Curated annotation (Swiss-Prot):
One of its GO terms (molecular function) is protein transmembrane transporter activity. Residues 36-82 are annotated as: Disordered. It is found in: Cell membrane. It comes from the Bacteria. Belongs to the TatA/E family. GO terms for cellular component: TAT protein transport complex. Forms a complex with TatC. One of its GO terms (biological process) is protein transport by the Tat complex. Keywords: Cell membrane, Membrane, Protein transport, Translocation, Transmembrane, Transmembrane helix, Transport. The keyword Transmembrane applies. This is Sec-independent protein translocase protein TatA. It comes from Deinococcus deserti (strain DSM 17065 / CIP 109153 / LMG 22923 / VCD115). Residues 36-47 have a biased composition (Basic and acidic residues). Part of the twin-arginine translocation (Tat) system that transports large folded proteins containing a characteristic twin-arginine motif in their signal peptide across membranes. TatA could form the protein-conducting channel of the Tat system.
């Protein structure tokens, strides 16, 4: 499919050297190596278990403060009219 010959590979290396500069190439390679190493480690290590979702009744939140809004009336029972 993508058969790169020696000329294409040399051309790619020259373009990369022009873009990043000769001084940055070792740092670029080191960073890529670390990234690949971390990726491989993550692939081999099992992921930690996910926390269980519990059924917590949802509360209404005040749109301004974000604080839970009480569903109970704030008027004392003696002041209520029936």
């Amino acid at each position: 499919m993508l058969g790169f010959g020696p000329f294409e590979l040399i051309l790619i290396v020259v373009i990369i050297a022009l873009l990043f500069g000769a001084r940055k190439l070792p740092e670029l390679g080191k960073g890529m190596g670390r990234g690949i190493k971390e990726f491989k480690q993550e692939m081999h290590e099992p992921s930690p278990p996910r926390p269980q979702v519990t059924d917590i009744p949802s509360q209404r939140l005040d749109p301004v403060t974000g604080a839970p809004v009480s569903t109970e009336s704030t008027v004392p029972a003696s002041d209520r009219r029936s």
